[in-house]
């Protein structure tokens, strides 16, 4: 797994240019600022719940802090799983069922990012906070799911990851170990370290352009990615329904529904290559 990750990152690193030099070279187009035409730009995209909301995926987190009438502590923490695994499995079973409903499909924003990856190839990396598979279904392949994946489970003892499309019952066990261990959702809960962070920070240090889509800017470490990218000279872009908590950090900003602003941005970007 580790070698595959660094192989993917080495491809993203190809043709590294002088990052600081391009900061002094800007072209102004109306309300947008884009870097001077770069040869083989490396693009890192971060997506959050806002990109999937238009596909019918509920964000679950309500204004009162409840997730589907449950306290976060009960359904999205290791302690909650230890106290009541049945409740936690039922919660994620419902989310898994919803994701696989026929009406849940990638929207125009997902499809635009797949188009962008097709054009850029190995110079594109997508980091998502979402645990759905809509990016994959749209056609993206170079993806890091930093918060895990809903259609996977893992052994609570060995960490082995398994594909899983159906419900998970408390009595379901993983038999990869000498002693069968409970299965848990392959998702990152509060208090746990997000996945792929070493690879993500290395990619942030090499990106020419950093784009955040549908993120609130409330959740760290992802909220700090824009600052990290800027430190290394990347041009930063926010595509969101409204300004995020860290919106002031971005050099370029476009606001509106993801299904509208993302395809528009991608089309203009690709025309400038």
From Swiss-Prot:
SUPFAM superfamilies xrefs:
DHS-like NAD/FAD-binding domain
Instruction: State the organism named in the record.
Output: Salmonella typhimurium (strain LT2 / SGSC1412 / ATCC 700720)
Keyword set, alphabetical order: Cytoplasm, Metal-binding, NAD, Transferase, Zinc
- PANTHER family referenced in this protein's UniProt entry, alphabetically: NAD-DEPENDENT PROTEIN DEACYLASE, NAD-DEPENDENT PROTEIN DEACYLASE SIRTUIN-5, MITOCHONDRIAL-RELATED
Q: Other remarks?
A: Originally isolated genetically as functioning in cobalamin biosynthesis and in propionate catabolism.
Provide the binding site for NAD(+): 48-67, 129-132, 214-216, 240-242, 258
**Cofactors per UniProt?**
Zn(2+)
Q: Which residues of this UniProt protein bind substrate?
A: 92, 95
Q: What is this protein called?
A: NAD-dependent protein deacylase
Q: Where in the cell is it found?
A: Cytoplasm
Catalysed reactions, as listed in the record:
N(6)-acetyl-L-lysyl-[protein] + NAD(+) + H2O = 2''-O-acetyl-ADP-D-ribose + nicotinamide + L-lysyl-[protein]; N(6)-succinyl-L-lysyl-[protein] + NAD(+) + H2O = 2''-O-succinyl-ADP-D-ribose + nicotinamide + L-lysyl-[protein]; N(6)-(2-hydroxyisobutanoyl)-L-lysyl-[protein] + NAD(+) + H2O = 2''-O-(2-hydroxyisobutanoyl)-ADP-D-ribose + nicotinamide + L-lysyl-[protein]
Q: Name the phenotypic consequences of knocking out this gene.
A: Single mutant grows on cobinamide (CBI), CBI plus 5,6-dimethylbenzimidazole (DMB) and cobalamin (CBL); double cobB-cobT deletion mutants do not grow on CBI plus DMB. Single mutant does not grow on propionate. Acetyl-CoA synthetase (acs) accumulates in an inactive, acetylated form. Considerably decreased growth on 1,2-propanediol, cells do not excrete more propanediol than wild-type.
A Pfam cross-reference name = SIR2
Instruction: Fill in the domain comment.
Output: 2 residues (Tyr-92 and Arg-95) present in a large hydrophobic pocket are probably involved in substrate specificity. They are important for desuccinylation activity, but dispensable for deacetylation activity.
At which positions is Zn(2+) bound? 155, 174
């Amino acid at each position: 797994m580790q070698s595959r990750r660094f192989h993917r990152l080495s491809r993203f690193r190809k043709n590294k240019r002088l990052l600081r030099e391009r900061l002094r070279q800007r072209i102004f187009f109306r309300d947008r600022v884009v870097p001077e035409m770069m040869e083989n730009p490396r693009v890192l995209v971060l997506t959050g719940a806002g990109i999937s909301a238009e596909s019918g995926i509920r964000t679950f987190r309500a204004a009162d802090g409840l997730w589907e009438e449950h306290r976060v502590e009960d359904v999205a923490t290791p302690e909650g799983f230890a106290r009541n695994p049945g409740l936690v499995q039922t919660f994620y079973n419902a989310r898994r069922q919803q994701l696989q409903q026929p009406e849940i499909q990638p929207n125009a924003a997902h499809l635009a990012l797949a188009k962008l990856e097709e054009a850029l190839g190995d110079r594109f990396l997508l980091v998502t906070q979402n645990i759905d598979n809509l990016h994959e279904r749209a056609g993206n392949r170079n993806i890091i799911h930093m918060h895990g994946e809903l259609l996977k489970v893992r052994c609570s003892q060995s960490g082995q990851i398994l594909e899983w499309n159906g419900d998970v019952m408390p009595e379901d066990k993983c038999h990869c170990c000498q002693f069968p261990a409970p299965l848990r959702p392959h998702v990152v809960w509060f208090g746990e370290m997000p996945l792929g962070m070493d690879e993500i920070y290395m990619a942030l240090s090499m990106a020419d352009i950093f784009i955040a889509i549908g993120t609130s800017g409330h959740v760290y470490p992802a909220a700090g990615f824009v600052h990290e990218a800027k430190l290394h000279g990347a041009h930063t872009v926010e595509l969101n329904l409204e300004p995020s908590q860290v919106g002031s950090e971005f050099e370029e900003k476009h606001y509106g529904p993801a299904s509208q602003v993302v395809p528009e941005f991608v089309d203009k970007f690709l025309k400038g290559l």
